[in-house]
Amino acid sequence: MSSQLNDPTPIPAQSSLSFTQGFLLGQLSVVLLIAAFIKFFIFGEAPPPPSRGLSHRSATHRRSNSIFSSAQHDGSTRTLREKPSNSNVLRPVPSSATNTRSILRKTYYTAIPTNPSSKHGRHRIHHSSHQPESLDWFNVLIAQTIAQYRQTAYLLKDSPTSSILNSLTAALNNPEKKPSFIDKITVTDISLGEEFPIFSNCRIIAVDDPNSDGGRLQALMDVDLSDDNLSIAVETQLLLNYPKPCSAILPVALSISVVRFSGTLCISLVPASTPPLDTPSHSPSPPTAQTTTAGRSKREDQTSGSHSHAGGSSKEPSGENPPKTSPKSNVAFSFLPDYRLDLSVRSLIGSRSRLQDVPKVAQLVEARVHAWFEERVVEPRVQVVGLPDLWPRMGRTGVRTGDDSETGSNVPRSSTAADASGSARHEDSSREPEVLRFGSLLGTRPPFDLASRTSSFNVETGDLRSRSMTREESNGNLSDQFHMPGSLPGSGVATT
């Protein structure tokens, strides 16, 4: 009995084993949690930045696509019956034949369903169920046009006064826009690219417009351009003008390349009688197509008046002549706010110890390029370009060489036409040293007869305006001149 009481009770070994297992399991779980945190939260990939398209998508659908939304006609449109009796021979066109629905029906485009009136005074976009167009033929035409521009620019690279290098240098060194702390800007490299923009997914939409019957039609098309060879490189110096001029000089070299551009291009026809477009109050009001045309006609009148005074003519000053009132149609184009413009900016600052590819410089340049682009061709701002006169005229008639019908197509010209062509050629020769004349791009062009000539593109080297198309009629006078939108920062192109 006493031996049983003195024997010690054996301690079970499972208690120490279970404690060790629990301790190891706890340490392992902590290690796994730390490893997962480091892997997924520290070394994980950053989320992609929000796309411009997503940020502006709601604004795109809610925006007012009518560029006439805030302008109203001062008076009702006069019909042909209200004109003087000498114009009553022309039959009036019924409004039902010129509205949007009639145009879509007669061109076999899918009819647009009737939608209720817009809310809050906003203009509705009526999308069509018609199959979008591929625009393959349009891409070929645009590619040929761009290729001819590139070839012309290369052929004229050695021109002393009309090369693209001199034009860009004069534009970048405009004393009215270049700050005083920047020295002369020298263009060191220009590449016009090798690829071509691709247009696709063209669709026609109708926009509610109170100024027109049945709304207004717009063409929307997607455009995409990927070209690493579209670049420009410049060199300049930053000047420190305190306490005395040119106290310190810092050399700067920049290279800007357009890596990719994509967006939605919006094109619509604008009648010449449309009121001017509204601009935000914080920026100066840019000239519209009408003001540009009026200013250009005024300059032409002043030029013709100076010639008349120089020749001893007794006519009154041409500034008092009544302006031409023939209506002209315009094309308005712009890009939707959800565009994408990727730039590659390389910089080199300093002379001895140089800083290469400074991120802050790249950000400043990209912001300036985006601001320049949005101030000109991004909704609600549009570029307005006047349409040329497409009526067939003998002054623009030419004959292709090598055709069998060359003899039969050459009708005798009158002495008046010959004199007019002679005066036109004299004016062309007098203006030749001042402007860049784009000639033949595909070898030799067919020789035209005495009274025929084609349109010519002129590049002005004094400012940043791009090529202006000038057309001369058979009487040798300049007419119907309009300016294409610019493509460089600081451009003085008419913007709406």
Curated annotation (Swiss-Prot):
Basic and acidic residues bias (residue ranges): 75-84, 424-434, 462-474
GO molecular function: lipid binding
InterPro entries: Mmm1, MMM1_dom, SMP_LBD
Subcellular location: Endoplasmic reticulum membrane
Domain SMP-LTD: 131-388
Stretches with biased composition (Pro residues): 276-287
Residue intervals annotated with topology Lumenal: 1-22
Any one GO CC term of the record: endoplasmic reticulum membrane
Protein name stated in the entry: Maintenance of mitochondrial morphology protein 1
Annotated source species: Aspergillus fumigatus (strain ATCC MYA-4609 / CBS 101355 / FGSC A1100 / Af293) (Neosartorya fumigata)
GN (gene name): mmm1
